[in-house]
């Protein structure tokens, strides 16, 4: 709240010593209108400071400005004359300035009432907007007569630049403070006191290494508890030593989890700044950080240690993780009446403790080992002894040196059908004796444990913040690790403050509490926390990590200096050979020689460097920058080395980066003899490129380039073309100018000069020639013009099989002028099938996957199908191979359903009945696709199932158009049993049978139809059910049977009940309601998630 607002309540000094905060009174200062600091000499403040540290923390820091808490006072003289805001001098806590702010407060609606405004201000004069600091404080007005009667109120607030003060507008009534009888004012002086406890600030220059000796981990965002877990494992020093000793010399630096863990540990040990973890999570093989959001710290800890343990096998540190974290327990079941006991020994690496309804960790351990009575309906199956009353429990055989305790704060709530967080108070001690929970104790080595780490979560089940409090040396000196910020803290902050539950001072529900604890066995403390020095880190690992750092620093420097440089891409003439497209080369396939050049370096300097690198003297090379023309082509253009030699590279490139240059060189065979490039007169000469087209092979052949005068006639070039192509002289040639894609002009007149024969003659123009041979007419593409037209329409299309997930497909080169049948024919040849047995699908525009199917009579072209793809985007279509011709298939519909075979097993099938047909047609299609039983009726029926219950049987004449699929229901086809083909409607009935366990809405398994007879004993019905389900007698004895109607169930007395068909008929007047059904109440031994639900993926490290 803003301290300028008027308040509606007034606090009386004598009512309480420590008041509770009231929302309408606890306020933030007005940052838009900061209080004016009065300079009147009549009013002044005297500050009295006292160090709030306890004796145990005196050695935390010599520089008290970095302390975590302090008490300071501010005495306001001539208090009765106070008319404006006044601030105390600063008191530094966490190296931030804290001030007391006092002001009189008036109320427009109550002019005769006045109160004292009392606020705590933090870092108000900073210009930064990124800082924040969470603090708790007690604001107090001192009673000079009796300190016990001093009036105080408590605040808790996150201070930041917009809310840099917090407190109370009406801390006390003015009349109460100024009443001499109350003891708050003496000689017109009032003393204000603040005790403040602050967390380490964020967004300021906080040096964790300097103040604690440790550094934090950067927050990647969405990594939740990982930083807390990594710090916990890092300070398990014996584990850290073992991780360093893992051989990783040959590991891939981006995929090796041990190497990534070594890197994080090494940097935590040696860095002065927060350490990044992106390389570690990348080594897990995770593309996103979603895994952190879906799972808990126990799962990550378990899979991470499992991964490292597996990779320690066969090394000098094999067995380290079991040695540190593994304990043993025995699960037992002891029968009461017979001599039968079942024991199962198990290893464990952590213990999950229930905290709901438990006061402390001892009660949770008692609950963990509590004996469960197996009696009544829950008797134990003791084999040949049958069902017996028994006791079930666990006992700890051994406890590990490092004990991980998972506190079950996150639990599933069946009432709300979601996970909730339990914020109840739960106490845990600094020293934990556990001998009483061991089956056998060792007097020489009692199971006494010292608290080493407290992992804490603030927030609710949907999100929050994670920190860890660590006792690094096991000596009771605690630090708080809050991502990148590490700070000293008191033992109370680390332990008592994280019990959870109610805060006695603030009367608000604590959502900050411990969810995992790490204890170390006292006898193993020195071994587990043994010092880790540089001598414990293999030299080759140090060298590798330091080399990584050097390379990263070099790359960082390059990025910082990148704006000073540009790239020059050199393309040599050999890259033009074999090119079958427009222009001189394919930009996506060409291999450049790349130079990193200072933008301000001169052309002459670059040419000199280029000459040395390429191994040609400067008179044997010439530069031709590739210039984009207005018609979309890219051709070489003249660059005058002499005239432009002093110009800068960025100037000549016209800010193009990268800048591509064609490098012309002397023929390497002639270079050794000292040959130089011929002179080129830029005003009178032109450079042309020559290509020869061969209609027989439908291919282009690069024939080099020539210098020729602009006035030269076309006919004068014919001998050069014949020579370059290997034709005999005077061979009749047809010439074309390659103007741009899809525009190739024939040159008709050979007796005119180049500037008249070619359109807008320029350096880099291309002449394409071919033999004038009548046999060319037999070629599919007889002329260069038709070749380039075909090339313009040519497109590579990826065809993927729709039925194969993530199918990479195959590439076919097609013309975008092709129609549907031409495309189908080409693809069918590739697949060695009939074009009529293929169906094609468009690609979805918004995601990579098949879209709507194409009809076989589609009248558009391939260009129409691909028009929504971007120019450089891979073109993709989908197909599926059919078992019937597409003309027949298009008149059918796809119908997914479940087939229940004669072994009472379900399988998903897809049928293709006539889309205008009925259920009878669907059943006939099913007969073709499945195998029917040998001793069955040969007749099929279609059932509709919702929530594992049969809700109806569809008639054979019902139209398929009326059966629309939905995610909530399933269609099942099954063969009608012989005993259900003919039903005596007067005395018999088909009823629905479904499985459930305790709650009738929790159905599961395979429902079925059962024939019952009027008046038959229910034991006969049970025999048919047992035979159908093929269940052993002992298991079937556990089944209970109920008639379920309208969500309510009534259990059947199996020995007395005789079937009454009316019990399974709808109630009169409620014929629209579902029929009653027979429920089989038993435990669901099948996996809890069905094929109809999305499977939740387990957290997994892939590398």
From Swiss-Prot:
Which tissues carry this protein?
Strongly expressed in the testis, spleen and brain. Weakly expressed in the stomach, small intestine, skeletal muscle and uterus.
Under catalytic activity, the entry for this protein gives: Thiol-dependent hydrolysis of ester, thioester, amide, peptide and isopeptide bonds formed by the C-terminal Gly of ubiquitin (a 76-residue protein attached to proteins as an intracellular targeting signal)
The EC number(s) given in the record are 3.4.19.12
Identify the SMART domains for this entry.
MATH (SM00061)
* Chain positions found as Phosphoserine: 19, 50, 54, 964
Low complexity: compositionally biased ranges: 1-11
> Which stretches of sequence are listed as region Interaction with p53/TP53 and MDM2?
54-209
Post-translationally, this protein is described as follows, namely: Polyneddylated.
USP domain residues are: 215-522
- Location of region: Interaction with TSPYL5: 1-209
Major localization listed first in the record, in broad terms: nucleus
* Domain comment (free text): The C-terminus plays a role in its oligomerization.
Instruction: Name it.
Output: Ubiquitin carboxyl-terminal hydrolase 7
Q: Which organism is it from?
A: Rattus norvegicus
> The organism's lineage?
Eukaryota, Metazoa, Chordata, Craniata, Vertebrata
